[in-house]
Amino acid sequence: MAGCTQQISEGNRGVIMGQIKVEKNVGGIEGLCVIEPAVHGDNRGYFMETYSQRDMAEAGLDIPFVQDNQSMSVKGVLRGLHFQKNYPQTKLVRAIKGSVFDVAVDLRAGSATYGKWYGVLLTEENKKQFLIPKGFAHGFLVLSETAEFCYKCDDFYHANDEGGLAWNDPAIGIEWPDVVGTYQGSASAEGYALSDSTPLNLSGKDQLWSTISETFQF
């Protein structure tokens, strides 16, 4: 299924609301947004508002977030693709250290872009944020030596409700940057590495997820 990597140039258009610039429906997928906060810097350092409910509401994104999460991962770690089946979550994600390639896959029944993916590079330098609505699977790959990743959620984590998809499902066709390897019919990380020979590192659970066609039948 078709997908794309997020490439914002200075010429791309976005809606500026207060201290944020919002690009909506990125990749042609309704609801996905890339948010760029205004960064005020000088020779002392910088300041920015990492989240403003007022600015988000003015941009039409008034989301009642209830939980903040933070993770640290080393290079080559791939987490995903995750979703909650009965308690779907909207997520606002960003990298506060290092760099990650962050991906969302549309799982909404009846969506014109069902099965389509979109990816964006989130780094401590570009400070971009990725808003992923309910009804998407989410995952990310760490490209730096380490990365710290933060995200806001509008529902709580329910361990017994977690679902997932194979990160390398050929029907979805995510183009994970710098990953070398050949699909062997499962989500196993065996035989996969980054181009510098760093092994791809997935949890045991994430190597057991099935393909989108095996997981959903509408």
Predicted region positions:
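Non-catalytic, conserved peripheral segments adjacent to functional cores
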Residues: 4, 14-125, 144-146, 153-218
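Intrinsically disordered, low-complexity polyampholyte segments enriched for Lys and acidic residues
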Residues: 10-12
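Cationic, low-complexity basic patches in intrinsically disordered or flexible, solvent-exposed regions
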Residues: 7
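Short beta-strand His + acidic residue motifs that chelate non-heme Fe in jelly-roll/DSBH
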Residues: 130, 138-143, 151
